[in-house]
Amino acid sequence: MSRRRFVAGVAGLAGAAVTGAFARVARAATPDRYDYIIVGAGTAGLPAAIFASQRGARVLLLDAAGDIGGTLHLSTGQMSAAGTRLQASRGIVDTPQAHYDDVMRISRNTADPILTRIAVDEAAKTFDWLMERGFEPLPEHPVLGKGHEPYSQKRYYWGADGGRSILAVLRREFEKERLAGRIDLRLQTPVSALLTDAAGAVRGVRVKSGDREQVHFGRHVLLTCGGYGSNAEMFERLSGYRAYAATGYPYSQGAGIELAVAVGGYVRGRQNYLSNFGSILTDDAIPGRFLARFVVIPQERQPWEVFVNARGERFIREDEMSVDAREHSLLSQPDLRYWIVFDEAILSAAPPGVGGWTREQMRETFGVHKWFQQADDLATLARNSGIDPEGLQRTVAEFNRGVARGKDALGRVHMPKPIAKPPFYAIRHQGHSTTATVGIAVDDRLRVIRQDGSPIPNLFAAGELLGAGQTQGRSFVGGMMVTPALSFGRILGERLPLTSHA
């Protein structure tokens, strides 16, 4: 995607106009000057503010929301770190190099090696800091993994309250610094533009507060305002896939991308898009709302059903143990969509497939919810569901032959029953992702860079704004979004030079 095309929708933020505004304000008055202006009070912005303030920096922290925390309010808060004190106390020998090797193995070497190296090298320091200040992981942690491809060593942690367990620690530390008078917090204050000088260096921000605009100047401007998961138009434009489910943080609107691109930054990472293996949504709206999820993890429930795409074809063995393999198999299916097909004998005998539902709840939903279809024959079931009838009939017949001879065409092992007794059932599953795969390009010092690799002076970025694909590649690697965001925010707060008065 060309930069010219991307910024067409935000031409009002173009560099010349913003530079002119900077010059007019500079002539008119001398506003407060901060050491740090941090745009976004979430997973990366909070540690940046805390650590900068602890050094004596004067910090302005801005957020469009009405509370600090960002996606930590919704996140599972999964972290990964190697060489932590908790690991040592439990006799677990681990290193950042082993962590790095695992990330590259799981991502098939698609994660950015520079940012990933920084993330794993800094992870233990970040995690130990949280633990020292009261973070409590679940008692059995660390673990190898859950919901994502497992690590080779136990380095995966989260708290009982998910992301809020992390936020509770950050909020306490943040309030200490705010009450000390070194952090100026402005909530419900979106940033409308970055201010640049004639040389292209970022000097401050323009904000909207109520019905009026203000400008603030600072030595370092940090963009930590998250991704674009709740901006359906930007999601499709950048990721190349539709935003099928509205399950993200409502303020993840891509504001940081617009701000950075308007002053010369660019986006990268489109090739790393990956969907999860699907959910049941409330309706056909795009984006839709989450309703439930069929248990498709064989470690939790062995499959009795078959999974078919819109052509009625199976596309992966249903008892495939690798979640990464399942997720990648869905990328090539039309609309990231598939159906879970079974019959009355399976519904009666198998453990209920929809997570948290009883068999009776499932029965009551067929014929009521559009994504739950039943019919007395496979052809009718297919037509009502949106599946090719001939394809489905052919697939079920082939599967049943495999059950009879004890050998499946795709290598599936668990095949307790054929699909033969009417009525027949189909439940639609929709793949989706709420994380921002694409993000703003930065260098090894987290400076926002132009396409020629040169840094934009005084402008930095961290968190999901960098794109999930930078530290995960084309995979979902456990803990490699939350922990890098925390660590990169901490690094920026610790290491950027301060003005002489601080």
Question: Which positions does each model-derived feature cover?
Answer:
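Conserved redox-cofactor binding core of oxidoreductases
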Residues: 119-212, 218, 232-233, 280-282, ...
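N-terminal secretory signal peptides and thylakoid transit peptides that target proteins
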Residues: 1-13
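Glycine-rich FAD pyrophosphate-binding loop
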Residues: 55-72
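Glycine-rich active-site loop/strand segments that organize a redox cofactor
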Residues: 81-119
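Glycine-rich loop(s) and the adjacent beta-strand/alpha-helix scaffold that form part
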Residues: 216-284, 482, 488-491
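An anion/pyrophosphate-binding glycine-rich loop and adjacent beta-alpha core
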Residues: 257-259, 263-385
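A glycine-rich dinucleotide-binding beta-alpha-beta segment and adjacent secondary-structure elements
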Residues: 391-473
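Beta1/beta-strand and adjacent pyrophosphate-binding region of the FAD-binding site
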Residues: 31-42
